[in-house]
């Protein structure tokens, strides 16, 4: 939602001030380059508490990079290069640049530095009013399941070894078999931990075997999440077999 703000910030005229005149802000392709420079590759929003990976030099929001720092062998989410979590540092130069540009709030039109835009938008009455008027989610057919805004994401998962994101269940199995077949580390199964019965602290002794035996099918396709794990597994197996 901040992409238009970045372009607006890049194209606004510079106010005169003390010292030598500043060069005109970039426009066109240069503005697009500025937008890319200030956007986190993970959340695609303006950087928030930006941090940089020393090895490859890529920058992310501190919070966005956190899942990668929790795995035994972290990889850069952008280039997949291994990195040392101890060598992730605050991107001070990026924060300084964010503080030098202002853009109008999309709700109240007040000019705010890009560094403070997220916090401003979260408390802006005009923005909240706009959000309140947005259409609300309504299921196409009646369902006993909670609406999506109230349930965890069970469609995509994060690799517990390297932090690769947005993997569906089959992609997670394929990714782990191709990239982590010989990794001896005990890790938490992201599929199981997303389930109501899952234990987010339990680490599988042999995660790859667990994946192959437990997660050949998608729980989302077959499972009623209101029943316990064993009943859900049996129901899913029965329905899966009936489709084959």
Curated annotation (Swiss-Prot):
Region (Disordered): 10-30
EC class of the enzyme, as a word: transferase
Record localization: Cytoplasm
Biased composition (Pro residues): 15-28
Main location: cytoplasm
ZnF endpoints (C2HC RNF-type): 105-124
Binding residue positions for Zn(2+): 105, 108, 120, 124
Coiled-coil zones: none
GO molecular function: ubiquitin protein ligase activity; zinc ion binding
Biochemical pathway: Protein modification; protein ubiquitination
ZnF (RING-type) residues: 40-80
GO biological process, one term: protein polyubiquitination
Record InterPro entries: Di19_Zn-bd (IPR008598), RNF_E3_ubiq-protein_ligase (IPR051438), UIM_dom (IPR003903), ZF_C2HC_RNF (IPR034734), Znf_RING (IPR001841), Znf_RING/FYVE/PHD (IPR013083), Znf_RING_CS (IPR017907)
Enzyme nomenclature, EC number: 2.3.2.27
Keywords: Cytoplasm, Metal-binding, Transferase, Ubl conjugation pathway, Zinc, Zinc-finger
Start and end residues of each UIM domain: 228-244
Catalytic activity, reaction form: S-ubiquitinyl-[E2 ubiquitin-conjugating enzyme]-L-cysteine + [acceptor protein]-L-lysine = [E2 ubiquitin-conjugating enzyme]-L-cysteine + N(6)-ubiquitinyl-[acceptor protein]-L-lysine
Listed GO CC annotations: cytoplasm
Record-linked PROSITE patterns: UIM, ZF_C2HC_RNF, ZF_RING_1, ZF_RING_2
Entry function: E3 ubiquitin-protein ligase that promotes the ubiquitination of different substrates.
Protein name: E3 ubiquitin-protein ligase RNF166
């Amino acid at each position: 939602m901040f992409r238009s703000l970045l372009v607006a910030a890049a194209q606004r005229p510079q106010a005169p001030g003390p010292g030598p005149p500043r060069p005109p802000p970039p426009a066109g392709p240069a503005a697009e380059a500025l937008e890319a420079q200030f956007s986190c590759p993970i959340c695609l929003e303006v950087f928030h508490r930006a941090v940089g990976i020393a090895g490859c030099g890529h920058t992310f929001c501190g919070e966005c990079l956190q899942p990668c720092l929790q795995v035994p062998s972290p990889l850069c989410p952008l280039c997949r290069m291994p990195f040392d979590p101890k060598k992730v540092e605050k991107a001070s130069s990026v924060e300084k640049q964010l503080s030098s540009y202002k853009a109008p709030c999309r709700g109240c039109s007040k000019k705010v530095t890009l560094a403070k835009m997220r916090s401003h938008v979260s408390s802006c009455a005009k923005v909240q009013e706009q959000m309140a008027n947005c259409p609300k989610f309504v299921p196409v057919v009646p369902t006993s399941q909670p609406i999506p805004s109230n349930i965890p994401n069970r469609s995509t998962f994060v690799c517990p070894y390297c932090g690769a994101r947005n993997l569906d269940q089959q992609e997670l199995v394929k990714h782990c078999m191709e990239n982590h077949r010989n990794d001896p580390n005990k890790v938490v199964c992201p599929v199981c931990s997303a389930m109501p019965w899952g234990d987010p602290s339990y680490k599988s002794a042999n995660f790859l075997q667990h994946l192959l035996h437990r997660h050949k099918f998608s729980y989302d396709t077959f499972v009623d999440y209101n029943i316990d794990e064993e009943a859900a597994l049996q129901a899913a197996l029965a329905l899966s077999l009936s489709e084959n």
